[in-house]
Amino acid sequence: MANGKFYQTDFVSRGGKVSSSEHGAWMWNKLFDQDFDQTLTDANLKPCEGNKAVLIATSSGWTNYRHQADILAYYQELKKNGFTDDDLILIMADDLAYDSKNPYPGQIIRNNKSLENLYSDVKIDYKLDQISPLDLKNILLGKSNEKLSVVLDSDDSDNVLLLWSGHGAPGTLLWDENQKTITGDFMSDLFNEMYAAGKYRKLFGIIEACYAGSVAAKCKGVPNLLLMTAANDKETSKAELYAPLWNTYLSNSFTMAMLETLQGENYYDLSIRDLYSDTFSKTMGSHVTLYNMESFGNVFFNYVFEYFCKF
C-alpha cells in the first residue's frame, strides 16, 4: 500500500514461482524510481588510463550458493571484456564446486538451462576464511604483507569496480559465517582512505545484500564514489531461480537483472543511469538504489564501459 492505494507486484516466491501482474509491478516501481540531477558535473579528473575490479562473495555454504555463483558470473563477464587475472582480485569461500550436494561436481552453474560452468579457469586470490575485514581494507589500500601478497594495484588514473554479494542487516554487511560485520562507517572510512591514497580515479561499487542501502548511505560525500545497491536501507534483497536439482537458489533477483542488462546492451552506449533504470525495472521484491551521485558526477554521462570493459 502506498499513497492510500494498494499495488500488487510480481514477486519471485521462495518456491521459485512468479505471481501477480506485470502492470502492478510497474505501478509500484514507478512510485520509487529515483530522479537524477542532469546538471551535475564531474570533477576535473585526469584521463582514465586503466581499470581494475575487486569481486567479493561474503557468504559460504550450500544454501548461500547464489552469492558465489553471481560473483563468478561477473568474473566471467569481465574476462570476456578483456580483463586478465592481473586486473582482478577475487575473494570467495570456494566451498561449492566439490560439495557433496553438487549435482555437477567440479562445476558451479548459475543457469540451469545453458549449464555454463562458471568455475572454469577461475583464479581465486583469497578464500573467505583466510582474511578478515581488516585484511580487506589493506587489500583495497594496496598494503601488501606476508599474508596479503595480492593487493589492489591502482592509482588515481584508474577506474575501480567493486562487486559485492552476500548477506546484510540494518547498518551492516555480514562477513563470513562467523557473522563479523562491516558497518557503514567502516566502508565510508575505507573509501575516504582509498581516495586520499590515490587508489582510484572513480570507484563504482555494486552491492547485492539485504539492507545494503543502509551501508551505502553512510558513504555520502566520498569523492568520486558511486554505489548501487540491490535494496534500500529498509528492505531485504531477494533470491531468485530456485533449482530443484540443486535444492537451492542459483542467483539473486538484482544480479539476474543486472547481468541481463549488461549482456543485452552495447556497453559503450549504456550510461550508468540507463543501467540503473533497466536493472530497477527488472528487479522484483526490492528497490535498486544509487547513492552519492552528488560527489560522483552526472550518471547520464558516465558510461558502463568505463568500469566493465578493459582499457
Residues covered by each model-derived region:
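Cysteine endopeptidase catalytic domains of the caspase/legumain-like
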Residues: 1-311
